[in-house]
Amino acid sequence: EVGHRYVLNATSAEVLDTAARGETHPIIPSYVDYETYVSEGGYKLLGDLRAGRIGKEDILKVLDDSSLRGLGGAGFPTGRKWRAVLGEPGPRLMAVNGDEGEPGTFKDRFYLLRDVHRFLEGTLIAAHIIDAEDVYIYLRDEYPAALKLLPLEIAKLPAGGPRIHMRRGAGAYICGEETALFESI
C-alpha cells in the first residue's frame, strides 16, 4: 500500500513508480450509487416503515421467523436483541461494527464498496426499529476506500433519520471486540 492506494502484486519498482506518480489516494470501485439504488426500489422498505405502512413489530416478526442471528460468535437472535434494546430507557445509540479482523474475511468491505446503500438502508431500518438517535459506523483503518466512499453517499441521504457518525478503527483486531469498540468510539 502506498499512502492509501493498494498496489496489487507489488514489486519494489511498482511501489516506487506508484509513489513517484503521486497515486496515494484509495481507488473507489464501481458501486451501486444512491440514484441507482432508489431507481431499483431501494429505501422503499425504510420509507414504508417511517410512514407507518409497516410496523416495527412486523419487521421484528420477520427477523424472528427468519432465525437471523448475529455473527459475533454467540449467534444471538437479532429480533430478540433488538427487543432487548427497546426495553431499555433512551436515549439510544447504535454502533455498526465494520472492523472485521478475522483472517481472510472481507464481507463488510465488499458490501461497503459495492452495495453501500443496501448497507445504509439496513442500518437505518435497525436504527428506526430501536429508536436510535445516533448511529456510529466503526470501520477498520485498512479500508480507506470505504472510509472515503461512505461519507459521500451518506451526504446523499434525505434528512429525517438519525445522525450518522463515522469512526475509524485503530487498526488492531481487538478493536472489533464489543467493549473495545465502544471504548474506541
Where are the model-predicted features located?
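Feature of Fe-S/electron-transfer and energy-metabolism proteins
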Residues: E1-I185
